[in-house]
Amino acid sequence: MSYFGTDGIRGKFGELPITPDFILKLGYVTGLVLIENNQNSPRKPSVVIGKDTRLSGYVIEGALQAGFNAAGVDVYMLGPLPTPAIAHLTRSFNADAGVVISASHNPYYDNGIKFFSADGKKLTDAMQNAINDKLDAIMAVDGNNDAVMPILDPAQLGKNNRIDDAKGRYIEFCKGSFPYQYDLDHLTVVVDCANGAGYSVAPRVMRELGANVIAINNKPDGININADCGSTHPEGLQEAVLKYEADVGIALDGDGDRIVMVDEAGNLVDGDGILYVLATQGQTKVAGVVGTLMSNMGLELALKAADIEFTRAKVGDRYVMQELEANGWILGGEPSGHILCLDKSRTGDAIIASLQILAVMQARGKALSDLTEGFEVLPQKLVNVRLSQMQDPFEHEELVVAFDKARATLEGRGRLLIRQSGTEPMIRVMVESDDEIECDVMANDLADKIKAILG
């Protein structure tokens, strides 16, 4: 079976695959794959491990570390840091892989594992498949770990190292992405840290560049990550920007790879708006932009008017990355806030993306609301339909007929997208139309029909 979804391995803690026993085996077989891929190297393979602020992260961290060490792989423990920090530090430490313990924007009771290759990018399909195959083999042997996890001579075991300066290294990396000729003096910035991995580093980066920072949701307790805060719940940020009369608001998600922003008037600027500003007014001229199937048609039209090419990838930042590399472009992302600026970082990074927007504001002397003029969002309605178990809606004829009828209604003036989540039992229904009422009615009607049939 395939243990990997669109963004690593994810689930509810305590249920397969997110159990200590499974995670131990995952660390072990991943270690074996790294050893096989580095047979000609004179040194042991090494990995860096970071996490977000979930309580379950401590248990998973220990199990992963033990699995890697048992396979003969050295481990560098970085503690709570954003996902993009782990991608950067994987390269900085010359490690063979990076591992992030996080379920991103999900609630605290979920957790997951994401991997980076030695170059700080998402794992190749080939390496992911190799890990998956070894997991299949080890899970097939019931109740006898010694049969599938041979004990090494103690001299061959991996070592465990805790790194104290990882946070400082990442902060300097982020600051280095901001143009040296500008600073953030005289800017008041509200930062919603989602009680997640960026709770410490995000406000500090902004302060060290000169901003007056008001940090909210920056006191994680292990269970309040993403709880009515962060990029998936920006209402509190919008209120805070207005309350403190701030110049801009920035909201991260739980693992710090997604960002949405709020302008000085309290208006939300999602990933599409961020891409529009960076593509049309950013410091680096771009030939084209990669969005996804979820990107608003308004972004496509606005970029076309600016003579900038636009193409859509499948949903997921790994697919955006693949499309960017195929086209030789540097800018892409998703409405949810995964923003890839490949001239600055090799993965989606909320802090670095926000700094590029702040740089445009400072360079042009304009407010964020002024920078987003010219980008008109087409009415869009997104409804998430949670199911009791993962099911394919396209296997039910009644649903297929309903989808076809809706697409015919929208032809030439809107879009319908039906998509299964890659990480949880959920169907996403997205409707775009030049008629806002039609959007709401059609999306809700289709969602109700999916729920009634699939349960």
Swiss-Prot record:
Catalysed reactions listed for this entry: alpha-D-glucosamine 1-phosphate = D-glucosamine 6-phosphate
Listed GO biological process terms: carbohydrate metabolic process; peptidoglycan biosynthetic process; UDP-N-acetylglucosamine biosynthetic process
Cofactor annotation comment: Binds 1 Mg(2+) ion per subunit.
Requisite cofactors: Mg(2+)
UniProt key word Phosphoprotein: yes
Active-site residue list: S104
Keyword Cytoplasm tagged: no
Modified-residue entries (Phosphoserine), positions: S104
Matches recorded under HAMAP family: GlmM_B
Family: Belongs to the phosphohexose mutase family.
Function: Catalyzes the conversion of glucosamine-6-phosphate to glucosamine-1-phosphate.
Name assigned to this protein: Phosphoglucosamine mutase
Organism from which the protein derives: Psychrobacter cryohalolentis (strain ATCC BAA-1226 / DSM 17306 / VKM B-2378 / K5)
